[in-house]
Amino acid sequence: MKTIDELLAEGVAGKRVFVRADLNVPLDGTTITDDGRIRAVVPTIAKLAEAGARVVVASHLGRPKGAPDPAFSLAPAATRLGELLGAEVAFAADTVGESARAAVAGLADGRVAVVENLRFNAGETSKDDAERGAFADQLAQLADVYVGDGFGAVHRKHASVFDLPARLPHYAGYLIATEVGVLKKLTTDVHRPYAVVLGGAKVSDKLGVIDHLLERADRILIGGGMAYTFLKAKGYEVGSSLLQEDQIPAVREYLRRAEEKGVEFVLPVDVVVAPSFPDLKTKAPAHPTTVAADAMPAGQMGLDNGPETNKLYASKLADAATVFWNGPMGVFEHPDFADGTRAVAQALVDSSAFSVVGGGDSAAAVRILGFDENAFGHISTGGGASLEYLEGKTLPGLAALED
């Protein structure tokens, strides 16, 4: 995989460099609530601009239906990128149309333009190779060189990620090079004890990575909505908590295999429950109570790890040399259910372990709960991408950069 440093050594002054970034940031209306993904790509864009490139930045945001939708416009992200770069950033109101062509044609050396949301075009995410290829052909007309730096999208076989690099000289940006380097440490040269913390809503999203980690991790700590399927698999009642009944046989098999391989599987011993899911807009009090994990009452929903679990998990992380964490321990967006996620983050801050926060909601939680990002070994920008990398899957966006 050739890197941006090789491109810079060849010289980029006056060249149109297409940067496939990941500006898929959470929005409240037009207000960005977490700009972490934008900040992560700034080093690549800034270095290219400094070297005199004409930088064309493209990204997706959200899941529009292959047509323009103002709710998913990249305009707020383009504005924020300009603030972070300390330079004016042009914004094109379409992706490959008249506005985009004019914005790119008007770029002076060292300037940056952002084109509108890639997913406003059906060809970006099409399952049809020809349709995707046709859109990639249009994108290729905007550039002379391709730099892949949207790690959060490398697991997608999309036109801008997979097809476009085949049409242009291609290089990996700083973010992708860093992300791959960190994840390689977790797969090839891991320092032990190796602890993994998995949370989030659905156990089905994590089965592949659990299967992989049973061969590598020393202990696996489970939290979040997925924990209740594990507790049910152990024979506990879980009230009205999130439950994937169809996954119980798979979970039981993983618990059996973990025991067989000597991998410690750690589940909550107490949980914070409430009668219903909390209101995340008003943050109204949710009337939580703490109960033992094996004594959850009917009609109550588990929404966070309890204080005894938080102490237990902190003790299990204290002596780890390496920690990978993906997924919050509870509904951290509500103050009544944030302590479990906060406790894991604090345990990683207090530990001397090399800690990797695996993107998505856990990365957002670290920032929202006020932790210093530099206190962690690495905060990934790719939730799904980092999980699929750890599963050993071929990621289309990385494979395209290898060729």
UniProtKB/Swiss-Prot annotation:
GO terms for molecular function: ADP binding; ATP binding; phosphoglycerate kinase activity. Substrate binds at D22, L23, N24, R37, H60, L61, G62, R63, R119, R156. ATP binds at K206, G302, E333, G359, G360, D361, S362. It is an enzyme of class 2 (transferase). Its main location: cytoplasm. Keywords: ATP-binding, Cytoplasm, Glycolysis, Kinase, Nucleotide-binding, Transferase. Coiled coil: none annotated. Pathway: Carbohydrate degradation; glycolysis; pyruvate from D-glyceraldehyde 3-phosphate: step 2/5. Disulfide bonds: none annotated. It is found in: Cytoplasm. InterPro entries: Phosphoglycerate_kinase, Phosphoglycerate_kinase_CS, Phosphoglycerate_kinase_N, Phosphoglycerate_kinase_sf. One of its GO terms (cellular component) is cytosol. It comes from the Bacteria. Its EC number is 2.7.2.3. Pfam families: PGK. One of its GO terms (biological process) is glycolytic process. It catalyses: (2R)-3-phosphoglycerate + ATP = (2R)-3-phospho-glyceroyl phosphate + ADP. Belongs to the phosphoglycerate kinase family. Monomer. This is Phosphoglycerate kinase.
